[in-house]
Curated annotation (Swiss-Prot):
Cytoplasmic side: 204-260
Gene Ontology cellular-component terms listed: plasma membrane
Residue ranges crossing the lipid bilayer per the database entry: 3-23, 27-47, 152-172, 183-203
Organism this protein belongs to: Borreliella burgdorferi (strain ATCC 35210 / DSM 4680 / CIP 102532 / B31) (Borrelia burgdorferi)
Alphabetical GO biological process terms: bacterial-type flagellum-dependent swarming motility; chemotaxis; proton transmembrane transport
Quaternary structure (record): Each stator complex is composed of 4 MotA and 2 MotB subunits. 2 A subunits and 1 B subunit are thought to form a single ion channel, so that each stator complex contains two channels.
Annotated function: MotA and MotB comprise the stator element of the flagellar motor complex. Required for rotation of the flagellar motor. Probable transmembrane proton channel.
Keyword tags: Cell inner membrane, Cell membrane, Chemotaxis, Flagellar rotation, Hydrogen ion transport, Ion transport, Membrane, Transmembrane, Transmembrane helix, Transport
Location(s) in or outside the cell: Cell inner membrane
Gene: motA
A Pfam family of this chain: MotA_ExbB
Protein name: Motility protein A
Superkingdom of origin: Bacteria
């Protein structure tokens, strides 16, 4: 589980609820079922109208990515690439065929399979980058979905406010109810703002971050696979791939190699 996402939502909602509780009216005035209906159902309906059904059905999956802790094991991948490079330099590319079953990453395995099969370097580069591009297009569907929802929620919040104001103006003779009616009219705007800025935008940004990290790992794999095919020195390959690591991961890689 990604504790940062859970803590972020918990602290955010907690801060809002505590702030509401300390108002003179308490929490009760901030709850209105019709406002929830307009904001949540209205924005979701518009989202469905503007998106593919397949994408909308995957909302639970996208939320799962938001709460999941993502680990890409870059150090382990680099170590495997260096080991494969060393073996290829000593025994030839065909000797790597026996090592393919030990590679768990499908993208990594398909790239090495192309190398062992003797595919042209440009063909390998094109195929792997095409697969990377398609992956990013799939990821973009999810982030764009929540980006759209973040735009729609405040709009429907304002719609609810306008509905409330129309109802308020239609009942001006009851002056004792003006204050409470105005409060109810504004609640939908509050709901829309909370949904957009605390719920949907963080999910969108997290999905974009996951896409960036995964694309970086796959780019690293592509460069490593092509270097193995071209017969680069394993130490040069290692130094090149270390540029994809953070200083902390570089230290981990150096210590693991030094301990072997």
């Amino acid at each position: 589980m990604n504790l940062a996402s859970i803590i972020g939502w918990g602290v955010g909602f907690g801060a809002i609820l505590i702030s509401m509780a300390f108002t003179p009216t308490g929490l009760g005035v901030f709850w209105d079922l019709s406002s929830v209906f307009i904001t949540v159902v209205g924005s979701f309906s518009a989202l469905m109208a503007s998106s593919e059904v397949v994408a909308v059905k995957k909302i639970p999956t996208y939320l799962g990515f938001f709460f999941r802790r993502n680990s890409y094991a870059k150090v382990s991948i680099i170590k495997i690439l260096v080991e494969l490079s060393e073996k290829a330099r000593k025994e030839g590319l065909l000797s790597l065929d026996d090592e393919l079953e030990q590679i768990n990453d499908p993208f990594f395995k398909s790239g090495m399979r192309l190398v062992v099969d003797g595919a042209d370097p440009e063909v390998i580069r094109t195929m792997l980058y095409l697969e990377l591009d398609q992956m990013q297009e799939r990821h973009k569907v999810g982030s764009d979905l929540f980006k759209t929802w973040a735009k729609l929620a405040p709009a429907f919040g304002m719609t609810g406010t306008l509905i409330g104001l129309v109802a308020l103006l239609g009942n001006l003779e009851d002056k004792s109810a003006l204050g409470s009616s105005m409060a109810v009219a504004l609640i939908t705007t509050l709901y829309g703002t909370i949904m957009a800025n605390l719920m949907f935008t963080p999910v969108q940004l997290k999905l974009e971050k996951i896409d960036t990290e995964e694309a970086a790992v796959k780019t690293m794999i592509i460069e490593g696979v092509l270097s193995i095919q071209s017969g680069d020195n394993p130490r040069i390959l290692e130094q090149k791939l270390m540029t994809f690591l953070t200083p902390k991961d570089r230290s981990q890689l150096n210590s693991s190699i030094g301990g072997e």
